[in-house]
Amino acid sequence: LSLDSSNIQPEEWQLIARQTAEACRDHDGIIITHGTDTMAYTASALTYMLRGVPIPVVLTGSQLPLVHPLSDAPDNLRCAAAMAASGIPGVFLAFDRKVMLGCRGVKVRTSGFDAFESINYPPVARVTGAGLELHRELIPAQTEDFRLEDGLCTQVFLLKLTPGLDPGIFDLLLQSNYRGVLIEAFGAG
């Protein structure tokens, strides 16, 4: 695919998942380069679509293009390559010398090389002067056989609760064609 990541749709996630599942048969690790605007969404989707993936699948990208003299792309690719070579199965996001679980990475900054954070879970690895420092105890064990689950429901609405939100939004959602509503509520305190 050669697509601006802001244009990616669930159909592309399905295509990426299918191609990755096929490639798992012949490779020991896979690196997927991706634009940063939606990379976290793709990493999360792949985490749930590639159930029990037997090899490392690592997504990475860069804030500055590869041809830019100060690009972060080479460092991010090295980080992704180190994780892909680790042999540890799972879907991961590698960025700014950190490796996080694919379902935990979130883009939190639009500029700056530290654009991604692992939310409510520490990074599972870091690249340091000593190489890739893995925290294996943080990586969930693969307990199921590999299978591709590429059926997606796109009729889900994400609602972020905010102070002053008009409760009438719930009536509108009930009248819509959505099959599910995910409510991003306030924290626990």
Residue spans for each PLM region:
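Short coil/turn connectors at secondary-structure junctions
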Residues: R25-G29, G52-P56, S86-G90, F95-D96, ...
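Short, small-residue-enriched loops and turns at beta-alpha junctions
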Residues: D4-N7, L66-V67, A188-G189
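Short Gly/Thr/Asp-enriched flexible loops that form oxyanion-binding sites at enzyme active sites
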Residues: I32-P54
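ATP/NTP phosphate-donor binding region
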Residues: L1-E22
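Short acidic, glycine-rich surface-loop motifs adjacent to enzyme active sites
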Residues: H27-M39, S176-A188
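Accessory alpha-helical/coil subdomains and C-terminal extensions
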Residues: L101-I183
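Short beta-strand segments
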Residues: I32-H34, V58-G61, F92-R97, K160, ...
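Internal gly/pro-rich beta-alpha loop/helix module
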Residues: L59-T128
